[in-house]
């Protein structure tokens, strides 16, 4: 009977994961179709439905593990990937509701889709199984520290991806735009480009502002996550900071986005220069979250691949 229940639970989890991935994949296609065909509002509504469905299923998967095993499911890489996928979809839905812009979904849906695909199809099965908590994780700080860090990663990833999109769309122009009658001029390295259609300028400004706002929201979460991690480390290991690879790269991530926010204050650095910093931050976040796990070194052993 116990084996039967375990198999049934595994099948339900597997179905939920597959449906979640399929929903996110469909939503990604729909968002891209909306970008290609702006008047087809049906695709946008269907994309919202699919993201919401995936979000609900991820809530079920996390809640089921929480209730069944009596601790919040953030004890290993697989569970953290599920939580990151949920964070990405939740933040996407909130931002879309607040800012009413389809670009957010077009940028966020590929990340959440790939994150969930990695957790479901690429991680070994033994890493997806539930195991007893190691002593260092038997703390109330588990929920506080890890959840806040992952939520910050979700915001920073979405915001920095928007900056990368900004760089791609503005790669032929500088952002020293001035208006002259009904035309918009942009300084180019060789000449002055006359933009008869102001839509591109408005789009660039929208992307730039969205990126700044989202990263501005994620940075305080990252700060709180690092501080709470230091307090927890002192309780668990007797030291606030040990220059563990994960700690070191978390600090590097914080510095990169602190530099980004500082560049936004300086007008000469706004636009492409600050977007380059944010784009670099996108890579650094993934190194901090996944890259250091390949090292197999440090105190954060529960996240290793090796």
Swiss-Prot record:
Q: Kindly state the subunit structure of this protein.
A: May interact with Ccs1.
| Gene name of this polypeptide | ccsA
Q: What organism does the record attribute this protein to?
A: Galdieria sulphuraria (Red alga)
Known role? Required during biogenesis of c-type cytochromes (cytochrome c6 and cytochrome f) at the step of heme attachment.
The record gives the membrane topology as:
Multi-pass membrane protein
* Superkingdom of source: Eukaryota
Molecular function as annotated in GO: heme binding
List residues traversing the bilayer.
Answer: 17-37, 41-61, 77-97, 103-123, 148-168, 214-234, 241-261, 275-295
Something else the entry says is: Although originally identified as Cyanidium caldarium, these sequences derive from Galdieria sulphuraria.
Q: Lineage in the entry?
A: Eukaryota, Rhodophyta, Bangiophyceae, Galdieriales, Galdieriaceae
- Chief location of this protein? plastid
Q: Which GO terms describe its biological process?
A: cytochrome complex assembly
Indicate what this protein is called per its UniProt record: Cytochrome c biogenesis protein CcsA
Keywords for this protein: Chloroplast, Cytochrome c-type biogenesis, Membrane, Plastid, Thylakoid, Transmembrane, Transmembrane helix
The record, for NCBIfam families, names: cytochr_II_ccsB
What cellular component terms from Gene Ontology apply here? chloroplast thylakoid membrane; plasma membrane
Instruction: Check the record and name the InterPro entries matching this protein.
Output: Cyt_c_assembly (IPR002541), Cyt_c_biogenesis_CcsA (IPR017562), Cyt_c_biogenesis_CcsA/CcmC (IPR045062)
Compartments it resides in: Plastid, Chloroplast thylakoid membrane
| Family, as annotated | Belongs to the CcmF/CycK/Ccl1/NrfE/CcsA family.
């Amino acid at each position: 009977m116990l084996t039967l229940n375990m198999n049934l639970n595994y099948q339900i989890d597997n179905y939920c994961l597959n449906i979640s991935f399929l929903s996110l994949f469909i939503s990604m296609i729909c968002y891209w179709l909306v970008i290609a065909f702006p008047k087809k509002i049906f695709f946008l509504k269907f994309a919202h439905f699919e993201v919401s469905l995936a979000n609900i299923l991820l809530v079920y998967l996390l809640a089921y593990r929480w209730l069944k095993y009596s601790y919040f499911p953030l004890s290993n890489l697989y569970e953290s990937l599920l939580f990151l996928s949920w964070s990405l979809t939740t933040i996407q839905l909130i931002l879309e509701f607040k800012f009413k812009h389809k670009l957010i979904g077009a940028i966020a849906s590929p990340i959440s889709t790939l994150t969930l695909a990695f957790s479901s199809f690429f991680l070994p099965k033994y890493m997806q199984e539930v195991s007893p908590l190691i002593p260092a994780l038997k703390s109330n700080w588990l929920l506080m520290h890890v959840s806040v860090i992952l939520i910050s990663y979700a915001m920073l990833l979405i915001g920095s991806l928007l900056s990368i999109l900004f760089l791609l769309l503005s790669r032929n122009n500088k952002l020293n735009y001035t208006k002259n009658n009904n035309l918009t001029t942009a300084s180019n390295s060789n000449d002055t480009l006359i933009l008869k259609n102001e839509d591109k300028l408005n789009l660039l400004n929208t992307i730039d502002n969205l990126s700044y706002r989202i990263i501005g929201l994620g940075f305080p979460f990252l700060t709180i996550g690092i501080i709470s991690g230091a307090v927890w480390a002192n309780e668990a290991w007797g030291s606030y900071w040990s220059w563990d690879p994960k700690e070191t790269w978390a600090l590097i991530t914080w510095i990169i986005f602190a530099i980004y926010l500082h560049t936004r204050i300086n007008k000469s650095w706004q636009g492409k220069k600050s977007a380059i910093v944010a784009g670099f931050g996108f890579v650094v976040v993934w190194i901090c979250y996944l890259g250091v796990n390949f090292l197999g070194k440090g105190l954060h052993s529960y996240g290793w691949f090796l």
